[in-house]
Amino acid sequence: ENGVDPVPAHTPVLYDDQRLHLVTLSRLVPHKRIEEAIDAVAGMDGAVLDVVGSGWWEDQLREYAAPYGDKVVFHRHVSEPYKHALLERAELHLLPSRKEGWGIAVIEAAQHGVPTVAYASAGGVADSIRDRETGRLVQPGEEFGEVVGETLGRREAMAPAARAWAARFSWEETGRRFAKVIGALN
């Protein structure tokens, strides 16, 4: 079982700019395919993609995003409280990677009631999203951007399930389940 740290007790309150914020938490390397998240937001009126993370592909991503101006904001590495403030403000978390392990970032977003859109074929991330309940797993033949748009329309309905799902992965709950497994071996 996996666990995640709790939301910090004190997080900054971010200015409400009346824009629709989507967020991606990722290392900035080619296989994470952040370009797909940029493309998904580029056509949305009043939307902003907050890109949190850094990596050797950052300059290429900044160049790719340049035509979209302030629709894409690169935050680089941020403190835990600031990361959670960005998640709290977000409507969706986008994870367009085609190869991913279990999704800690998915659960961190879910702690704030923020659903994640990711590829079903990405691997372990499919274990951290309950498709159509806590987020969306993009299936073969579906377009990432279209699924993002569809999921935005269901965000409020998914938020309570996302929060409840994330609570399963507190260290306390993870430890309780682990102890139960060990106890069953005796």
Residue ranges and their predicted role:
Residues 3:
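Carbohydrate-associated surface elements
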Residues 13-32, 38-42, 50:
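Conserved donor-binding/catalytic core segment of Leloir-type glycosyltransferases
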Residues 61-78:
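Nucleotide-activated donor-binding/catalytic signature segment of Leloir-type glycosyltransferases, i.e.
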Residues 77-78, 85-90:
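Short alpha-helical donor nucleotide-sugar binding micro-motif in glycosyltransferases
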Residues 98:
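Aromatic "clamp/platform" in nucleotide-sugar-dependent glycosyltransferases that forms part
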Residues 115-119:
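Short hydrophobic beta-strand element within catalytic cores of glycosyltransferases
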Residues 130-142, 149-154:
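Conserved acidic donor-binding segment of nucleotide-sugar-dependent glycosyltransferases
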Residues 156-169:
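A short, well-ordered alpha-helix in the C-terminal region of glycosyltransferases
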